[in-house]
Amino acid sequence: MFGKKQVLASVLLIPLLMTGCGVADQGEGRRDNNDVRNVNYRNPANDDMRNVNNRDNVDNNVNDNVNNNRVNDDNNNDRKLEVADEAADKVTDLKEVKHADIIVAGNQAYVAVVLTNGNKGAVENNLKKKIAKKVRSTDKNIDNVYVSANPDFVERMQGYGKRIQNGDPIAGLFDEFTQTVQRVFPNAE
């Protein structure tokens, strides 16, 4: 039925086909190898450290993978509180200010001041502008500066500052800080 030439051709053709198919995915590699590597795109001139005491310097992980299994990946850097001692020192240099505590959250600065004249609560707009100028001189990324001489706010800010500098967990502290700020500055954006 089949001649010797046909049998010989099919015997030679089958291994040739098998060899050809085996090389088809050369260089493809695995798509789900979870090859994670650290990549640092930080610019030291703009590394969001702002001369403060709370320095969380964590590199971002980058995953070169088609299936990177990211579920509930919050990577929320907005929940960062920093004590701005340099700004507080500059604000305290003002003759109207006896003491200042400043916490920076993102591009917002919250300033609690004890005034030399003993006034508690309201701070004059002129003085607020001077304070804001001093704060922004230490950090060009600050968009809004909120100032209060409310005794309760001053006390809370001192406590928050100590907790941040001591490295207390930020989750509960951030929520508590946010509630306090919303109560003292209800019109803040």
Curated annotation (Swiss-Prot):
Question: What is the annotated localization of this protein?
Answer: Forespore inner membrane
Indicate where this protein is primarily found: membrane
Q: What induces it?
A: Expression is dependent on sigma G, and to a much lesser extent on sigma F.
Q: Lipid (S-diacylglycerol cysteine) linked to which residue positions?
A: C21
UniProt keyword annotation of Membrane present: yes
Signal peptide start and end residues: 1-20
Write down what this protein is called: Probable spore germination lipoprotein YhcN
Provide the species name. Bacillus subtilis (strain 168)
Quick one: which gene encodes this? yhcN
